[in-house]
Curated annotation (Swiss-Prot):
GO cellular component terms attached to this protein's record: cytosol
Protein name: Peptide chain release factor 3
GO biological process, one term: regulation of translational termination
PANTHER family in the record: PEPTIDE CHAIN RELEASE FACTOR RF3 (PTHR43556:SF2)
Length: 529
């Protein structure tokens, strides 16, 4: 059966994001993925030493100064017969709620682990978010050109800490100065390592068969024997790859390599296009929308301010769920009920914007936005429904914000509410006093907010520390119990930017005790937009 041209386009799409701890090599992998997809011919070392060459996926003034990717940019590139959309996720200590929300807009994730360090804190947090939708995960063990931990130990750690089974696809031969290549368990082939730096992809020498004498000649008898011994262990002790379990988010195929040395990234990409799902169906408040439907639907998962320093515009990033976008099409913004003609949607190659004529499910569009679009907004061709699963996440860091000029309270509140609608930060107004508390997931969000308040709203603000450890959105089906809860905890209650009631806890101990005391009240870590 031949698929219609529309369904062929849908079937070609793969949309994924990379999750990792800072410095596990995410930006390098991003560049090498684009290199193998021929999207950029020179993958510049990320912080070009002494040169002004910036990595392709870093932008905005602050990013330029710090050499980090604050903004979740989007890159599209062809690979084999597929079109791959890679959503970049801010990686440093400077990551934000955008990073979490971006994971709600993809169909698959690549987890990058520094093989010298293993599972680290940020990776754990990001994996928790992927669990909200059981997103399929591929794993790349990076930095094999350095001395790494025992590979079996790494697999055990992923399984135990992240509660996902590991199915090794390739297996390393040596590491550091002795790194010789990887063996592919399912193709019975060894790929020999020759370092390719920058944008040179070396021709890889392949040795067929595990017992081929050429293998001993190429890597040395000791390493060849060690490989055979390890593989016996691996095949006995680890999971076989099973596509169904992968799609259910229960096992992860594991690849080994070095992104810096341009080695192993293509094996992972081959796996990604072969196994990662084409655009998936998504839930709305009324029904499930399939990617095969021809009527257009999409949702906004992120709003980016000021991508163009010359203009103060904002761009809303929209994930296409179904249907084909065509230039000049009329779409309904469900929240406002208004119909808008969209003739200037953008597609991105990180920072280079170009206007797009058409887009399909899995693609990401940039919509110009002058403050009228919010995170979580659904666009359709008229159907009144709202996509679910684009949450706010409970902040982990809090500051009180204070004005240098107290007469500008009105501008401050307006600025903060707009910034919170964009997802730059969350705002809480305690019920019992006139404080304004801002909450964030990453420290850099605080700097961004003060800088933007000054440049966009002409408001100078400073931060003070505040006695808040965490926040939870509260609700209850029992009105009487809820009233009692509100009465007795007034000093810990606040309203967020959307006027939702929030419990702000001074300590985790306080939160746990309060939850025990009020079993009829729900304390939520996430809130739907």
């Amino acid at each position: 059966m031949t698929l219609s041209p529309y369904l062929q386009e849908v079937a070609k799409r793969r949309t994924f994001a990379i999750i990792s701890h800072p410095d596990a090599g995410k930006t390098t992998i991003t560049e090498k993925v684009l290199l193998f997809g021929q999207a950029i011919q020179t993958a510049g070392t990320v912080k070009g030493r002494g040169s002004s060459q910036h990595a392709k996926s870093d932008w905005m003034e602050m990013e330029k100064q710090r050499g980090i990717s604050i903004t979740t940019s989007v890159m599209q590139f062809p690979y084999h017969d597929c079109l791959v959309n890679l959503l970049d996720t801010p990686g440093h200590e400077d990551f934000s709620e955008d990073t979490y929300r971006t994971l709600t807009a993809v169909d698959c994730c690549l987890m990058v682990i520094d093989a010298a360090k293993g599972v680290e804190d940020r990776t754990r947090k990001l994996m928790e978010v992927t669990r909200l939708r059981d997103t399929p995960i591929l794993t790349f063990m990076n930095k094999l050109d350095r001395d790494i931990r025992d590979p079996m130990e790494l697999l055990d750690e992923v399984e135990n800490e992240l509660k996902i089974g590991c199915a090794p696809i390739t297996w390393p031969i040596g590491c550091g100065k002795l790194f010789k290549g990887v063996y592919h368990l399912y193709k019975d082939e060894t790929y020999l390592y020759q370092t390719g730096k920058g944008h040179t992809i070396q021709e890889v020498r392949i040795v067929k068969g595990l017992n081929n004498p050429d293998l001993d000649a190429a890597v040395g008898e000791d390493l060849a024997q060690q490989l055979r011994d390890e593989l016996e262990l691996v095949q006995g002790a680890s999971n076989e790859f099973d596509e169904e379990l992968f799609l259910a988010g229960e096992i992860t195929p594991v690849f080994f390599g070095t992104a810096l040395g341009n080695f192993g990234v293509d094996h992972m990409l081959d796996g990604l296009v072969a196994w990662a799902p084409a655009p998936m169906p998504r839930q709305t408040d009324t029904r499930t929308v399939e990617a095969s439907e021809e009527k257009f639907t999409g949702f906004v998962f992120k709003i980016q301010a000021n991508m163009d320093p010359k203009h103060r515009d904002r761009v809303a990033f929209m994930r296409v769920v179904s249907g084909k976008y065509e230039k000049g099409m009329k779409l309904r913004q469900v929240r406002t009920g208004k119909d808008v003609v969209i003739s200037d949607a953008l597609t991105f190659m990180a920072g280079d914007r170009s206007h797009v004529e058409e887009a399909y499910p899995g693609d990401i569009l940039g919509l110009h936005n002058h403050g009228t679009i919010q995170i979580g907004d659904t666009f359709t061709q008229g159907e009144m429904m709202k996509f679910t699963g684009i949450p706010n996440f409970a902040p982990e860091l809090f500051r009180r914000i204070r004005l240098k000029d107290p007469l500008k309270q009105k501008q401050l509140l307006k600025g903060l509410v707009q910034l919170s609608e964009e997802g730059a930060v969350q705002v809480f107004r305690p019920i019992s006093n006139n404080d304004l508390i801002v909450g964030a997931v990453g420290v850099l969000q605080f700097d961004v907010v003060v800088a933007r308040l000054k440049s966009e709203y002409n408001v100078e603000a400073i931060y003070e520390s505040v006695n808040v450890a965490t926040a939870r959105w509260v609700e209850s089906a029992d009105a009487k119990k809820f009233e009692e809860f509100k009465r007795k905890n007034e000093t810990q209650l606040a309203l967020d930017g959307g006027d939702n009631l929030t419990y702000i806890a001074p300590t985790m101990v306080n939160l746990n005790l309060t939850q025990e005391r009020y079993p009829d009240v729900q304390f939520r870590k996430t809130r739907e937009h």
